[in-house]
Amino acid sequence: MCIRDSYTPEEVERLRGSIKIEYSMCKMQSQKLWRLLNTESYVNTLGSLSGNHAVQHAKAGLKAIYLSGWQVAADANSAGEMYPDQSLYPYDSAPKLVETMNNSLIRADQIQHMEMIDGDMDKSKRTDYMLPIIADGEAGFGGPLNVFELTKKFIRAGAAGVHFEDQLASEKKCGHMGGKVLVPTGTMIKNLKAARLAADI
């Protein structure tokens, strides 16, 4: 069964509301990521935890950025605390960081664009600053409703892709640690369907 099969087009349209909202950054970046994944043998990326890091990744020639949950937990969460990789930080921290990184990338692109128009920069030395960001959604910070809301926040922030772990959110541990508690397969499928619905709406 395909994840999309849970909701009919009519149900999605009904939930969408009368105002069609376009998230151009997310759409552009997800299409770019899809092209990369289908044309490159691999897509090398590094973890980034600030807007400046994202700009430096672009200048270094990377084609995508990874936003790791452990980095958000350790150093880049909205609580300003240092946490272990156990999803203890505020759930909106990673989407806020995606937005910050995209704002920095957009600004770097604007500066470069002005410099090229003004003749201060050779167009052949152009840097592609608009790198797709792949975000770690941890274990979703709860059940399907939480995954739905978190996915909406990532889309609004312009994430190109999000992945979710199949761990029980309330017992989440760092991926390389023992003693992890996994959710039943049916629960994980519900989480993925909720994320897909958020993207469709």
At which residue positions do the language-model features occur?
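Surface-exposed amphipathic alpha-helices with a cationic face
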Residues: K27-N38, V98-T127, L192, R196-D200
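Short, small-residue-biased leader/transition segments that mark boundaries at the very start
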Residues: M1-I3
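Short, well-ordered coil/turn segments that N-cap beta-strands
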Residues: T39-N44, L62-K63, Y129-L131, A159-A160, ...
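Phosphate/pyrophosphate-binding betaalpha-module
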Residues: G161, V181-I201
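Glycine-rich tight-turn/loop motif centered on a GG-T
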Residues: W70-V98, P144-L145, T151-K152, Q167-K190
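Hydrophobic faces of well-ordered beta-strands that scaffold small-molecule active sites
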Residues: N44-S48, I65-L67, L131-G137, V162-F164
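Active-site cofactor/substrate anionic-group-binding motifs, chiefly glycine-
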Residues: S48, H53-G119
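Glycine-rich anion/phosphate-binding loops
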Residues: N38, Y42-V55, K59, Y89-L97, ...
